Amino acid sequence: MKQRVHTRTWSSPGLAGRRPHLLVEDSRPALAISDFSLFQDAGFDVAFCRGPDSDPGACPLLRGQQCMLVAGADVVLHGLEPGLGVAAAIRRHRPELPVVIKQPRQEHGTAYPVPAGCVPLAYSCSVGGQIDALLRAEATARHAAAAGSGPEDASSPRAPL
């Protein structure tokens, strides 16, 4: 597998106990060297994946295989190119997993469509807004799982967070 993964998988240095696992997916090079301290301060263990770049075959999900990072995640912040289909593949493999999507604008100014079951992020430029959306999505999924709801219930709030 040619998966590109940050070397500090599920890292929260010096913190005890199980914290929600956040998978950040983004192809921007600057994020590959980020320490993600704001997400860690908000209570998440963080892993990072750069995605398949220009080779969709480099992503195990797009080949119909399991991705170990997605398997271990409690919530995903998805910022990869919408046309790759990674967000939809995540939902096919783990329909109960909340996927919060940054929505880039198309050339004519409208947002790309959000795959079924994913939650659009209204203000992706704000880290505070991202953290708030992730915390709400993870809590909604956790409550739905505790109540015995199906995956549809856990992902039903499709309004922008």
PLM features: what roles do these ranges have?
Residues 1-47, 51, 55-70, 91-92, ...:
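Non-catalytic signal-transmission and effector/linker regions of two-component phosphorelay proteins
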Residues 46, 97-99:
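Hydrophobic anchor at the start of a short beta-strand
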Residues 72-81:
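Active-site residues of response regulator receiver
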Residues 100, 119-121:
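Hydrophobic/aromatic beta-strand patches that form the interior of the parallel beta-sheet core
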Residues 104-109:
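Negatively charged, flexible loop motifs adjacent to catalytic sites
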